[in-house]
Amino acid sequence: MRDFIVKILVKIGLYKKAVALINYFKQIAQARIVKKYGVETLREADAALTETGHEMFLIFGTLLGAVRDHGFIPFDYDLDVGIVAEGPSEEIHKAMKAHGLKLTRTTYIRTEKGEWITEETYHYKGVGIDLYFFFEDGDDWYAFGPKHHEYKDWKEANATDGFPTVRAYVPQCKFERQDFLGVQIYMPVEADAWCRALYADDYMTPVKNWDLKTHKTRHKWTGERCYRRDY
């Protein structure tokens, strides 16, 4: 039944609007859970990744919230963190599991050498936390940011040509622990430069329905496509 409804919505051009409406209400509910368990989730993920020798830092919307709002962005429905690593490891998986974080999704790019894992999603007490892997490119690091398919629903996209994605570039720098809602979490010492790279120079001004295409950032479209595997 679901697939039939999706096909009808796609055919009449209402699929994206329907998804946006459904996601809006889902995100409101998820934002409440983030406010309740978000800090605890960050603390456990940080402890797990510290045990594996990684500095887990805030990134994307969670970093923006820390810098601009000194907390979670209103209606932020998940957490974004990163590590500089070539991908996941069994050691990371074991540590995250030991701290109560369940692996629920893997995002990857198909290459001639196999799957290039770019991101993993974990859940802790209902809070989703996206772990982005950052790769080196000259004096920069970059992570991949998957976007919605141009016109297909996610199941069809995942089974065919995947999702468009961007490389989000930030300047390499050191990290230092800073207070975030009572917990000491790594943030880039060049947080301002990172936010400008990710959200443009006017990032301190909240923008409703922010669109990457209308802002000058360091996101680069490369033609690469992402796929996801849910658990």
Please place each PLM-identified region on the residue numbering:
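Active-site nucleotide-donor binding segment shared across nucleotidyl transfer reactions
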Residues: 46-79, 86
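Tryptophan-centric aromatic hotspots in well-structured domains and transmembrane helices
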Residues: 57-62, 72-76, 173, 180, ...
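Short, structured secondary-structure boundary patches
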Residues: 76-83, 209-210, 227
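Alpha-helix initiation and N-capping motif
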Residues: 2, 89, 188-192
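Amphipathic alpha-helical segments
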Residues: 85-101
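Conserved catalytic core of two-metal-ion nucleotidyltransferases
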Residues: 26-46, 50, 97-188, 193-197, ...
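Helical scaffold of the NTase/Pol beta-like nucleotidyltransferase catalytic core
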Residues: 2-59
